[in-house]
């Protein structure tokens, strides 16, 4: 029984399904606070985008010998490499039809968030012979993570609501919601 529970938890946590569900939950909080019906297509997009990006991140950061890593997560991911690749590919392909159901304004915001997320993960700077990404710059990692989560889980649902439901949310309320979520994630 313990073994099955452990394997299930390992799968949910290390495959990044849990973190993708957390992103959906954060967007659901936004809908709840605004007292509106959640957009299932946007929630699906958010789930698969989070799953793809987090898996992409770990696959890019593959250590030389992951099987001897001191971190159980790294050992699990690379001992289930094909599963991780499969989940990532399914996630990416799931984004295509969902993107067609989102507004142009939402897609522009998503393009910005995708750019930030990829730049965060890719080694775009070179110092000596070593390459670094934005995540390696002291102090910016927490800011970028909190910004990406608050924009994708608060601003994105609001932008989509304003584009499709023809409702207007006061700018002050939007800023307050985004700032509160930013601080929540950063805490």
Which residues does each predicted region cover?
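Central hydrophobic cores of alpha-helical transmembrane segments in multi-pass inner-membrane proteins
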Residues: 24-28, 46-59, 92-94, 114-122
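Core segments of transmembrane alpha-helices
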Residues: 21-25, 87-94, 144-155
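Membrane-embedded alpha-helical segments that form the functional core of polytopic membrane enzymes
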Residues: 35-56, 111-116, 168-187
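Interhelical loop and helix-boundary elements at the membrane-water interface
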Residues: 2-19, 64-87, 120-147
